[in-house]
């Protein structure tokens, strides 16, 4: 019985067309590299960096550019950073402030539910799990393989709804975080698709 309940929970999470929820992920710092250097996580996942070994005294994990969402500070061999939690969808490049050639990237997709429907279906698109002071969200959409178009810009809502009554097709959505005070932005999140019949 317990296995059935767990399996149903996993299927429900995957039905959101995003990544399944993760409690924590650790990136290792080894030999002047972040491992893994490319990471895809669900919003709200706690990410830590652990410095295993290397030929230097310290490393950092510092988010690129003026968005400035995190900087772990110096990590010595054997130390683990405090958790970084990315609450909104987007793509977040980062580097070691001491060794700029050490780079990594974290991708956080939006979630859509359901992923298929009809012209009477209202689709839910989740951009973030919690409001973040000073941050807003931009959303783009495209029909099929068409060009990306701005749909909503600078919104504070964590969830938006989409209904398309004018026939079927495939729609894609992606979002990013931006800082209201200076306009700094994350990269666009991985795109998610809905199909309308």
Language-model segments: residues:
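Positively charged n-region of N-terminal signal peptides that target proteins for export
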Residues: 1-4
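Hydrophobic helical h-region of N-terminal Sec-dependent signal peptides
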Residues: 6-13
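Extracytoplasmic copper-binding redox domains, predominantly the cupredoxin/blue-copper superfamily
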Residues: 13-145
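Low-complexity, Ser/Thr/Pro-rich intrinsically disordered linker/stalk segments at domain junctions
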Residues: 110-197
């Amino acid at each position: 019985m317990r296995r059935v309940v767990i399996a149903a929970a996993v299927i429900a999470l995957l039905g959101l067309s995003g990544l399944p929820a993760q409690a924590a992920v650790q990136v290792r710092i080894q030999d002047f590299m972040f491992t893994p250097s490319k990471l895809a996580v669900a919003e709200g996942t706690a990410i830590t960096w652990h410095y295993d070994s290397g030929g230097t005294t310290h490393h950092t994990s510092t988010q690129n550019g003026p968005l400035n969402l995190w900087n772990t500070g110096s990590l010595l061999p054997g130390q683990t950073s405090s958790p970084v939690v990315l609450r909104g969808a987007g793509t977040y490049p980062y580097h070691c402030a001491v060794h700029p050639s050490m780079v990594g990237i974290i991708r956080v997709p939006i979630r859509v539910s359901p992923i298929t429907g009809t012209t009477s279906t209202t689709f839910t698109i989740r951009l973030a799990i919690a409001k973040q002071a000073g941050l807003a969200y931009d959303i783009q959409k495209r029909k099929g393989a068409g060009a990306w178009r701005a749909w909503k810009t600078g919104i504070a809502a964590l969830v938006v709804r989409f209904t398309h009554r004018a026939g079927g097709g495939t729609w894609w959505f992606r979002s990013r975080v931006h800082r209201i005070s200076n306009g700094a932005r994350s990269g666009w999140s991985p795109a998610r698709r809905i199909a309308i019949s």
